[in-house]
């Protein structure tokens, strides 16, 4: 049996966790400026993006929307955007190559976090927007979560995030949203 010519690592049940989150956008009611919703972890003193583990039987897109709502308190939906992707159009066979796609809700980033002996955490990141009346709902977090959510003007929100990886993901989301121009 031959080995793959590409560096390959397999993870089996118990060696990985699948997670998803989103960068939640809105237009500020007063100024119309783009804002991003960030989380302040009140115990760890960290500014983060909303994300969490996928439930059994749940799609990764549903996870992103659910976790964003649970952690921020804002109902949201995935925002169709124009972006580069290697995913083919539905039902169309094409060569594996980068292409520009319009109005898609694919992940804008994948984070693979090495967790040492616990394996890896794989996080799919999406772009979302407010759904419904845009009012915050209290009491959506799990008992073990201690987040305060806040919409901040997009550029400032990116600088506010504690970790560079989160900053890079939020910056890419902002670039895609501005390129699409739909919010």
Model-derived features: positions:
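Acidic, metal-coordinating catalytic segment for phosphate/diphosphate chemistry
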Residues: 1-30
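Short, solvent-exposed loop/turn segments that connect beta-strands within catalytic domains
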Residues: 28-35, 116-119
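Short, acidic/hydrophobic/Gly-rich beta-strand patch recurrent on exposed beta strands
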Residues: 37-41
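A short, flexible beta-alpha/helix-coil linker loop
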Residues: 44-46, 157-158
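A short gly/proline-enriched turn/hairpin at secondary-structure junctions
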Residues: 48-51
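Unchanged
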Residues: 53-168
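C-terminal helix/juxtamembrane-tail motif
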Residues: 171-183
């Amino acid at each position: 049996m031959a080995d793959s010519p590409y560096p390959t690592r397999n993870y089996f049940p118990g060696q990985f966790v699948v997670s998803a989150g989103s960068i939640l956008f809105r237009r500020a009611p007063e100024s119309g400026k783009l804002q991003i919703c960030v989380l302040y972890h009140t115990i760890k003193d960290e500014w983060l993006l909303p994300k969490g583990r996928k439930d059994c039987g749940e799609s990764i897109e549903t996870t992103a929307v659910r976790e964003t709502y649970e952690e921020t308190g804002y109902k949201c939906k995935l925002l169709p955007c124009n972006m580069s992707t290697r995913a083919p159009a539905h039902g169309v066979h094409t060569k594996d190559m980068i292409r520009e796609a319009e109005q898609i809700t694919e992940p804008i980033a994948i984070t693979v976090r090495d967790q040492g002996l616990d394996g890896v955490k794989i996080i799919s990141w999406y772009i979302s927007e407010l759904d419904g009346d845009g009012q915050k709902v209290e009491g959506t977090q799990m008992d073990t979560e201690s987040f305060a959510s806040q919409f901040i003007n997009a550029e400032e929100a990116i600088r506010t995030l504690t970790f560079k990886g989160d900053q890079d993901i939020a910056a890419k989301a902002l670039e895609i949203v501005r390129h699409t121009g739909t919010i």
